[in-house]
Each structure stands twice: as C-alpha cells, then as structure tokens.
C-alpha cells in the first residue's frame, strides 16, 4: 500500500503590577516560559539527542510542556497538516449535525490526487466516517480532498476555514495552502508549538483517538448508497501502535527532506497523558525514535505535586476607591507535573488593572510559579469577595467634577 511514511520501528525502549512572594520548598528539574497559555521547560532539560529539528513534549492535563527544542521554528508539516483538516472537519460536522454515515461522492479532482491515497475512483462513494478513517489511519491525500470538497465546496474554501480556525486559536506561526500537506510551498508552515495546540484540542474534544488508535480497519467503497463494490484495508502509518505502552495517536508526515519525517504522538499511562511533536527528522523512523525517547523521559520519574488548593488566598492588592484590599484566591488547584529532583518554588501574584466595583469570582490576575527564578507554571486568580467603591470616594469624584 502506498504511503507517505515508510520503514519499521527500530529497537528502542520504550506575565498597576502588585505582587506577593511566597516560598515553597520542593524538588523540580523542569522550568518553563509561558507562551500561548502553555508552560514550557526552560532549564535542567536533559539532552535527549533527538533527530527532529523541532520537538516538544507536554503533559496534557495542565498544558505543561516538559521538553522542547526549537518549538517555535516554522517547518513544513507535510501530512501532519491533516490534524487541522480533521479538526476543521469536526467543527463543521458538529455544527451542522451531519451524520457520520453520510455518503460522500469522490470527484474527478479528488480521485486523481497522488501520494498516499486509497484506491477509489471518480463517482464512487464512502461514508464520512470512512473518509476520516482513511485520513487519520492511512494518511490518504485523496480522502482529505474529498472531505474538504464535501464540507466546503472546494479544497480552496476548506483551506480558508483551516486558516480562520488557526487565527481563532491564536496560531501566529501557522498557515495552510493545502488540506493534505501535499505541497512544498513556503506559505504552508507550522511549528511544533502550534501543532501541539491543534492536537491538544482534538484530544480534549475526544473524537480523534477513536480513529488514531486503530492499527488496521476495513472500509467499504460504494458505487451508490447501499451499493457496496469492494472493501479496502487501511493500515496505520503510526509504527508505535501496539509497540509502545499507551500509544493511541495520532499523525505522521513526510514530504521528502524538505519536511523530514514528522510525527504527533500521544500516549496515556496510569491516567497521565503526554503529547509529543517531532518535525524534520532526516532519517527514516527518526520521528518514532524521538517519540520513544520523549515518552520515556516524560513517563520516567515525573509525578504530580499540588502546591496550593482551590480557593486558597494567594495575594492581595489595593484599588483606588476602597480602603479594603482586593484578595485573590485560586480558581483551581495549583498542580505541577515534574520530576522534582532539585529546586525551590516561589509564587508571584500579578494583578490586572483593576477598577471598582469588583465582583466575587471575577478574574483579577494571574499567579505565576517560579523555580530558580524561572516561570514554571501559571494559575488564574479570582476575587475572594465583592469590593465596591466607597461613598466617600464617589462624593469626592462628584465634587471634583463640579470644578473641572
């Protein structure tokens, strides 16, 4: 079967600024910077000797990145593009409530698409579910175009929707010109960071894994509704399925040396889910070797540590118009995922520009967590109670306005 990835798995083991500082003694080796709502590893990161030119590993429950190399470098994503294709498709399908057993006819344009593909001809039909299966499992380029044409009228219109979604997600280093990644255009690019954000959304919404976890699947080709003509076996391009504990996704990519071998992987072990991205590995299976190394690291000595609990007071600030301080409490538990070998934590409550009145539960700032003076995590602060502007300040404002 034709594919855009080849080879077999090698033998590998598996930021008005008010602040308050508090000290926490704990051990932690991973320190991070904050970008796009994620937190990133910034010190004591081991050299994993990875082959990809851009790599990233994150824990998905708290969007915490624990390993990174050139994660913001723009790269040609090749077939990894298809995770945005599927994410955009799910948005449309869910919005329009389209049944997954809907039949989709293959156009002449879709039928002639080259590269990784399924054997299907003009006028033949597949269900929507089968098209998505072919895209995710088998990386089928022609299925991607057929899906795009069905949902948006043309690939070009569908790609516009992909880029709109990227903009809405805040992906400033991502742009698409193709729905399947079958392009070498310098206007088609993304980063490991942006790709991780797309993949994370797919994981959180839950649809992708029921496709990406499948190693083999038969789909039926029809010459008309309820008129089957043959079966096609889909074989996953993900060589780690069944070979590495907990792996259940999600997408490979390759377009020659320009893209290198790419892979977005995810695995869940004992309730912890990790997400990895490798872009630009030049040797065959380098994308999978990188994934194994990152997963081994992330599942190694790491554990969860709760530093502070939900509703715990984390800082206070004075606001013009009241003698009372605005007190910030945690909206959620403050949890860190790390390997805790060394270090010291401190917290800094950074308040937004506040104006009265303030309502109980209103977001008023962010609590940053530091380790060795580097940001390792962040949490939202909300007001512990209502704070109103005192009558004396209201009266002073009115008197002032009389003379202005």
Regions found by a protein language model. Give the residues of each.
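Sec-dependent signal peptide recognition
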Residues: 22-28
